[in-house]
Amino acid sequence: MEWSQELWLLIKYLLLGLFQGFTEPIPVSSSGHLVLLQHFLGIEIEGLSFEVMVNFASLFAVIAIYRFDLLKLVKGSARYVLYQDAQGKGDFRISFYLLLATVPAVLAALLFKDWIETELKQLHVIAFALLITGMALWLIRHLNGRKQDGDITLKDALLVGLAQTAALIPGISRSGATIVAAMGLGWRQETALRFSFFLYIPISLGSGVLAISDIVQDPHFTALWIPYTIAFIGSFIASYVSLLWFMNIMRHGKLIYFALYCWLAGLIVLSLLS
């Protein structure tokens, strides 16, 4: 009996890792879906460390896919800072904008963390947030501006960073909010997508570092390190595949698919609550 329970525990965390990993890159709100999954399927997640682990897995998947672009950005920024190399000025500017755009979400998370945890993880809030995400995606479904990396302004970066704070609400997609804001400002789809996922790196890394003390003190981390590791691997693979798929969807201008899904998910949740 004990071995079957242990097997189910491993399967559960693998499925949770795959689920979170697949929903993280696409504009459907992975945090909102995780809350819905726990409520409607009665799945309990033991410990505080799980979400941090699977988010780190998604972070590594993003870095793996954009590794050459990121390496260019880091090298160019370093050349500009160390040697005042004019060729690296554009890379340094984008790096600065990414850090600046991270600030609003970090401040909002620090100021309103407890309120978000207690008040916003309500099912009706998530349902309405999904409907809003769907509407935002629908509004920009045909947009494809002309702004590339060299055309991004300080104001653009701040506005996209402010949009990212909306994703603190479960049901509002982080990638969706930032891509909608960027494309609304006239960015090209490819530029908006890349900046959105570059912006995911500091916010995810920062939240993970801040949570290290919680992980160390979490008694479940030691007891569940094998299931957590399996969830990490599953989340990495699912995030990698999901992001590549999302990039292909964006190239073909099919954001409407995600808008329809968010509407459907939001309406189903509301109907189940009524």
Curated annotation (Swiss-Prot):
Signal peptide, first to last residue: none
Domain of life of the organism encoding this protein: Bacteria
Alphabetical GO biological process terms: cell wall organization; peptidoglycan biosynthetic process; regulation of cell shape; response to antibiotic
Record bears the keyword RNA-binding: no
Annotated membrane topology: Multi-pass membrane protein
Catalytic activity: di-trans,octa-cis-undecaprenyl diphosphate + H2O = di-trans,octa-cis-undecaprenyl phosphate + phosphate + H(+)
Top-tier EC class: hydrolase
Enzyme Commission number(s) from the entry: 3.6.1.27
Pfam annotation, one family: BacA
Protein's UniProt keywords contain GTP-binding: no
InterPro entries cross-referenced by the UniProt entry: UppP
Disulfide partners: none
Keyword entries, A-Z: Antibiotic resistance, Cell membrane, Cell shape, Cell wall biogenesis/degradation, Hydrolase, Membrane, Peptidoglycan synthesis, Transmembrane, Transmembrane helix
Localization annotation: Cell membrane
Entry's transmembrane regions: 8-28, 45-65, 92-112, 120-140, 195-215, 230-250, 253-273
GO cellular component: plasma membrane
A molecular function GO annotation: undecaprenyl-diphosphatase activity
Miscellaneous comment text of the record: Bacitracin is thought to be involved in the inhibition of peptidoglycan synthesis by sequestering undecaprenyl diphosphate, thereby reducing the pool of lipid carrier available.
Family: Belongs to the UppP family.
Record's function text: Catalyzes the dephosphorylation of undecaprenyl diphosphate (UPP). Confers resistance to bacitracin.
Identification of the protein by name: Undecaprenyl-diphosphatase 1
Source species of the chain: Halalkalibacterium halodurans (strain ATCC BAA-125 / DSM 18197 / FERM 7344 / JCM 9153 / C-125)
